[in-house]
Structures are given as structure tokens and as C-alpha cells.
Amino acid sequence: MMSEKTQQRKLAGTKKKFTDYHQWNSAGVGTGATDTKKKKINHGANPETTTSGGCHSPEDKQQNRAQLKEENKASHQHQQALRRQLEAQDHTIRILMCQKTELETALHDSQDAARKFEEDSKDLAARLHHSWHFAGELQRALSAMSAEHERADKYIKELTKEREAMSLELFRNIITNKELKEKNAELQEKLRLVETEKSEIQLHIKELKRKLETDKIPLPQVQTNTLQEKMWRQEEELRDQEELRDQEKLRKHEEKMWRQEQRLRDQEKELREQEQQMQEQEEQMRKQEEQMRKQEEQMRKQEEQMRKQEEQMRKQEEQMRKQEEQMGKQEEQMGEQEEQMRKQEKQMLKQKEQMRKQEEQMWKQEEQIGEQEEQMRKQEEQMWKQEEQIGEQEEQMRKQEEQMWKQEEQMGEQMRKQEEQMGEQEEQIRKQEEQMGEQEEQMRKQEEQMGEQEEQMRKQEEQMGEQEEQMRKQEEQMGEQEEQMGEQEEQMRKQVERLQFKEERLWDEYEKMQEEEEKIRRQVEKRREKKERMGEQEKTQEERCSEPCLPPSKYPSDMSHPGSLEPAREAGKGYSHDNRTAQIMQLPPGMKNAQERPGLGSTSCIPFFYGGDKKKIKIISI
């Protein structure tokens, strides 16, 4: 702005000097030049018109004044034309300066936009690198989740296999329990039959006792009665002991069976609870698998979005690279334009220097003209010499005018070229402004896209944070479930060991029950054999008792007592089932002497049955 003001002041000063010079020239120099010309003309044509003193006549003066007026008018017109040219040049200079400032501001704005664009590109590159790093972390987390999912699948398969094995073992235990229950029922049925047989035998023994009591026993047989009573008491005690032992065995066996059934029920309950827990765990694992699948779907969508964003970022980088190339070209063009402007400024400076030199010459000429006018006003006598000098000066002025015309033509050509260049520059600047507007629009859209991408990235980061929190919770749940499954495995292993131990015990008890059943069966068989033997012995005893035991001189021959063999037979039938005891059954004794029973001898035949061995019954006579 200061340079423009100084230039305007200089131009105003030069214009003022030109006007003053032309006014002074029209007043003095022009008249002198015309007078000299007229003098020359008159001097050559009519020498009588001159006076003796060398002065002009009034007519010459009037002609000179008219010529001076015409020359003054022509010089004034020429001065106005020069002034207009100077004003046009000044206007063009101001336009060029304004364009220069506009170009400088546009260049500065373009440099700022390029700097901002470069910063945005660096920021985008940093965000892209961060997004790549985040995508890598997501990929690693996804691979870890897939590995964890595979481990969970393997663990679930192992648990399902163990559950199937446990269910099979439970089914086997249930089957064995059913078999044991059936065998226990059979044994209880057999025991019930044995107890019924035992009760029948006891009833039969009681009937025999009743018959023995109803029988008439002679008084002298005190020893036999006492022995019989002792035997009965012993038999009763043995029967009571056997009943107590049998009842105790049955009670213990029933308690064992009840305990086993209770244990089996508890085991079934525990297995049902474990199956329920396994089902709940499977449901949880299924839910976790569903969540994992949803998370994988979300991760896949996020990867797709990241891929799209990377594609957009790559396109934006390509656009930025193209824009940078365009900006480089524009900077080159701006550099060329600046170079042209510098050249134009140099030319303008040269032109100003030439104008300054011309002004100095004009000042010198004005000074010279002033001195000449002063000399012409003071010395009219030296007019002829001065006319020659003025002719030379006019020649110089003509040459200067020719130079000025040439300079004006050069300035017009230069101004035309500059106007063309300025038109081209304005067209280029307009195009650049349009491109910059498009670039600004693209940058605005890119900034909006980047804002949306940042919002999406922020949401994705929040989602990933939530997913990481869920994954951490799931890992904790998986750890707890693994611990629970480990505890359950340990419990199942212990239960399997307990079941195996119980199964072994059940098998041992089953074998013992089989042995007891075999013993009972053998006892029943032995009882049956004993009954048969007792029947045979009764027959043999009847045969033997039908004959006299002593000589007939001492005992009567009539031994056919009606109640003599019935107690023995009944005693044989009601023989006790215990093979470890020996029961003695006594037949009713004979007469005390032969006088009471005249049919018998002096001594009676009293047979006693006792068990000597396990399989033999001996008979002695008293």
C-alpha cells in the first residue's frame, strides 16, 4: 500500500511538472520557435520587413502568437494524450498490483489448504494404522475365542462321553438292583415258606406235646418224665434260639437290603441331580455358543466395515495424492506466474527508470528552456543564434516525441500482452478457484466421512470393549464351569468307585445269600431225608416192638398198648429240623411188674430214640 501511494504521488508530481512545463512552453518557447521560423521565412523571402534594429514587426508578432496558440493547443492535446496514457498505465499498474496481491493471497490460501490437507492425511494415516492395529487385535481375539470354543467343544464332548458312561453304569446298577430285588424277593419268599414249614413243625410238636400230656403216664416212671421234660425244655430252648437266630439274620438281612435300597435311591437321586446339572451346563454352553456365534457374526461385520473403510481410505489417499499432484502443478504455475510477475515488475521498474530519466531530462530541458527564455527575454539581439539552438532543440524534441511514441507503442504492446497474460492468469485463477472449491467440497465431504468413520470407530471400540467384557465374563464362567466340572468329575469318580465297591459288596452279599439259600435248601433236603428215615425207623420199631423184648417168664406177652407207639411215631414225624441237636423221644414204659400186666414179662421193653450221628438214629432198650 505504501509503494502504491508513493507511486501515485510521483505520478501526480510528474503530471504537475508536465502541465507546468507545457504551460510555460506555450507561453515562451512556442512563441520563440515560431518567431524564429517566421523570421527565417521572412528573412529569406522579404528582407525589408525587418527593422534596422533586428526586431519583428507587429504583424509578425501576431502571426507568431497565432502559431504559438496552435502549437500550444497541439502540445496541450499531446499532453492530454500522454496524461491519458499515463493514467491508463497507472490503472494497469494498480490492476496488476491488485492481481498480484490476490494471487499472493490465493497462493497463501492454497499453501494453507495444502498444509491442512497434509495434516489431515497424516491424521488419516495414523487412524488407518490404529484401525489396522485394532483389526489385528480383533483377529487375535477372534482366534483366541475360536481356540477357546474348540477347547469348550472338546470338553463338552468329553463330558457327554462321561455322562453316557455314567448313564450306562447307572443303567447297569439299576438292572443289578432290580435283579437283587428280585432275588431278595425270592429269598424272602423261600424264607417265608421255611418259616411256614417251621411254624407247621412247631404246631405239630405242640400237638405231640398235647397228646403226650393227655396220655396216661404211670407214676413210677419219674425218671423218664424228668428226662422227657428236660428234653422238651432243651428242645424248646433250642427252638427259641433258632428262631431268634433266624429272626436276627432276617432282620440284619432286611436292614442290609433296606440300606442298599436307600443307598441306591440316594445314588439315583444324586445321578438325577448330576444329570440336571449337566443339562443346565449344556444349556449354558449352548447359550454361550449362541453368544459366541453372534459375536463372531458381529466381528465378521466389523471386519467387513473395516475393509470398506480401508477401501475408502485408500480411495481418499488416491484422491489426496491426485490433489497433491494438482497442488504441485498449481504451485509450479504459481511459481511461473510469480516469475512472470517479477519479470513484469522488472520491466515496470525499467520503464519507471526510463520515465524518471526522461523526467530528469525534461527537468533539465525545462531548466535549459527557462534559461533560454530568460536569455531570450533579456537578449532579443541574439535571437538568430537562439533560433538555431531552438531548431536543434525542436529536432531533439521531435526525436524525443518519436521516442515517446515508440515507447507508447511498446507500452501499448506490453500492456496488451500483459492484459492477455492477465486474462490467462485470471482464467487460470478462476479454474484454480473452481478446483479449490471442488477440493474444499471434497475435503468437507471427507471430513464428514471421517467424522462418521470416527463415530463408527468409537461405537466399534465401545462394542469391542463390551465384547471384551463379555468375553472376560464368559472366560470366568468357563473357568468356574471347568472347576465345577472338575469337582463333578471328582464326585462322579468317587461315586463310580463307591458304586463299584457297593456292587462288589452286593455281589458278595448275593453270593452269601446264595450260600444261605443253598444251606437252607440242604437243610430242607436233610429234613426230608430225616423224615423218611424216621418213617422207616418207626416201621422197624413197630416191627421190633411187636415182639417181646425179654423172656416171657418175667414180662407178660401183651405189648400191644394202644398208646405205646403213637408218641414215638408222632415224635418221629415231629422230629426237629436242627441237625446239630439230638432229641430223645421216649415211648411210654411198660408195666411195673408182671402182676399188673399179666401178658408181659417181668421187665418191660422201653425203646429210646436219640441221634448219635448226623445221619443215624440209634435205639436202645431200657
UniProtKB/Swiss-Prot annotation:
Show the GO cellular component annotation of the record: cis-Golgi network
Q: Where is this region: Disordered?
A: 1-82, 251-496, 511-580
Classification via InterPro entries: GM130_C (IPR043937), GOLGA6L (IPR026737)
Superkingdom is Eukaryota
What keywords were assigned to this record?
Coiled coil
Compositionally skewed regions (Acidic residues) per UniProt: 477-489
Where is coiled-coil annotated? 100-534
Biased segments, Basic and acidic residues type: 57-74, 251-275, 283-332, 339-367, 374-388, 395-420, 511-546, 567-580
Concerning its family, UniProt says: Belongs to the GOLGA6 family.
**Which PANTHER family did the record assign?**
GOLGIN SUBFAMILY A MEMBER 6-LIKE PROTEIN 2, TRICHOHYALIN-RELATED
Q: What is this protein called?
A: Golgin subfamily A member 6-like protein 7
Q: What is the lineage of its organism?
A: Eukaryota, Metazoa, Chordata, Craniata, Vertebrata
